[in-house]
A protein has these predicted regions:
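Catalytic Walker B motif of ABC-type/P-loop ATPase nucleotide-binding domains
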Residues: 162-166
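Hydrophobic anchor residue at the start of the ABC signature
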Residues: 151
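Conserved ABC ATPase signature
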Residues: 137-141, 145
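Helix-to-loop junction immediately C-terminal to a conserved catalytic motif
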Residues: 48
């Protein structure tokens, strides 16, 4: 469960999140909508432990998330195994030398067995139509291929919570159709 209680955040004294209070239950889907600069990406960064409330609290599974907590390697690892973040711009997320390595990065950090990692990566490559691109460096891919790689890299981690910043950006019609089928499957799986 995610709980936000009186959360405030500002950039240079410009309020972005103002006294936000919300509870998100397991399996609940939430869509953030608003104009540019209204705080959607800021909230997603906060939910992923990349920034922290300047006022109020953010709790995940009953534990208040703080900068100190996230500096604790064991806690940070536990948290990031449970919360996945697909960035708006996939170039912000992709850094490995091949698509296959990109998809394996999270599971390797989680300490999974090599056979399990291979299976997760192969399944994600197949599901997202990336098998033929597995050995290519992400920087050589089209925007839509990069976005699918970014989504696949989170899929291989199997997080409890998915957060996506403009998941439809960079996707073509086929990618959008796939995403429209995929998102309900996450909800059905209780994520």
């Amino acid at each position: 469960m995610i709980q936000l209680d009186d959360v405030c955040f500002a950039y240079d004294d410009r309020p972005i999140l103002s006294h936000l209070t919300e509870t998100i239950e397991p399996g609940q889907a939430v869509l953030l909508s608003g104009p540019n600069g209204s705080g959607k990406s800021t909230l997603l960064r906060l939910l992923n432990g990349l920034i922290f409330p300047q006022q109020g609290t953010y709790s995940f599974d009953g534990t208040i998330i703080t900068a100190g907590k996230m500096r604790d390697h064991a806690y940070s690892k536990w948290f990031h195994q449970r919360v996945g973040y697909v960035w708006q711009n996939p170039d912000s997320q992709l850094f490995c030398s091949s698509v296959r390595e990109e998809l394996a990065f999270g599971p390797v950090q989680m300490g999974l067995k090599p056979a399990d990692i291979r299976q997760r990566v192969d399944d994600a490559l197949e599901l997202l139509g990336l098998t033929r691109l597995a050995s290519r460096p992400p920087y050589t891919l089209s925007g839509g291929e990069k976005k699918r790689t970014a989504i696949a890299s989170i899929l291989t981690m199997n997080p409890q919570v998915w957060t996506m910043d403009e998941p439809e950006s960079y996707l073509d019609a086929d990618g959008l159709a796939w995403l429209e089928d995929f998102l309900p499957s996450l909800k059905a799986a209780g994520k």
